[in-house]
Amino acid sequence: MDLGHWTLSEGVEITDETFGFVYLIECKTTGKKYIGKKQCKSRIKRKPLKGKKRNRIDSKESDWKTYTSSSNELNELIKKYGKENFEFKILKVCDSKWALAYYEIKEQIDNEVLFKEEYLNGIINCRIGNAPKLEMEKYHKNSK
């Protein structure tokens, strides 16, 4: 599978089922880092078929292969030093929106991005509810 400019961490694999991933971008010149998330798929609402009432929901691939970041500061550094001076690394793949939000926050807190100068993350922002039952089962299975 074509990954664009992204590299995979050891043991990480992107498949057609992947909903999104948590990533680390590091500037090789300055050592500055950024942890974020990106969805690989986006939902599209389509009109109902003739005679039906419910909208159809489809998905399409997002721009993840060329995506750099939502951080303006990081994008300015990429313009200044060039994309080739940055490492774009996928840390974890997720199969749901809930898991993607959870693991982005977990990675940011574990790395103390708000306390360390080398990180460009200026805010940890998330709206996340209780874990769906399926996610809880996966979490407990993987944490043993």
Regions found by a protein language model. Name each.
Residues M1-K144:
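Structure-specific nucleic-acid interaction/processing domains
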